[in-house]
């Protein structure tokens, strides 16, 4: 029983290490007014695993930090597209 508890405790400590935080810059060319970033940010914020969002109208970009164990770039671009603002990863 002690070995099982020790193994579970170790797994609980190590599990967060497996998940990696990633930051991606999305190009969102469809933002045409200063209120568009609000809609884009709201759409991205609904995606599970997103921890930080910075949307800038002037550059028409969204910089998103997320947990890649909970979401993916594809889910982020789908969220912006579903909100009416198609996006792609900026190279």
Swiss-Prot record:
Its main location: periplasm. Residues 22-88 form the HMA domain. InterPro entries: Heavy-metal-associated_CS, HMA_dom, HMA_dom_sf, MerP, MerP/CopZ. PROSITE patterns: HMA_1, HMA_2. The gene is merP. Belongs to the MerP family. GO terms for molecular function: mercury ion binding; mercury ion transmembrane transporter activity. Monomer. Residues 1-19 form the signal peptide. This is Mercuric transport protein periplasmic component. The keyword ATP-binding does not apply. It is found in: Periplasm. Keywords: Mercuric resistance, Mercury, Metal-binding, Periplasm, Plasmid, Signal. Hg(2+) binds at residues 33, 36. Involved in mercury resistance. Acts as a mercury scavenger that specifically binds to a mercuric ion in the periplasm and probably passes it to the cytoplasmic mercuric reductase MerA via the mercuric transport protein MerT. Pfam families: HMA. One of its GO terms (cellular component) is periplasmic space.
């Amino acid at each position: 029983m002690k070995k099982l508890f020790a193994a579970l405790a170790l797994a609980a400590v190590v599990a967060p290490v497996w998940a990696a935080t990633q930051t991606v810059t999305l190009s969102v060319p469809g933002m045409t007014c200063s209120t568009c970033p609000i809609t884009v940010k709201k759409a991205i914020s609904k995606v599970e695993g997103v921890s930080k969002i910075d949307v800038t109208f002037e550059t028409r970009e969204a910089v998103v930090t997320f947990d890649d164990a909970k979401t993916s770039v594809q889910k982020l671009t789908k969220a912006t597209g579903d909100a009416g603002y198609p996006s792609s990863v900026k190279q």
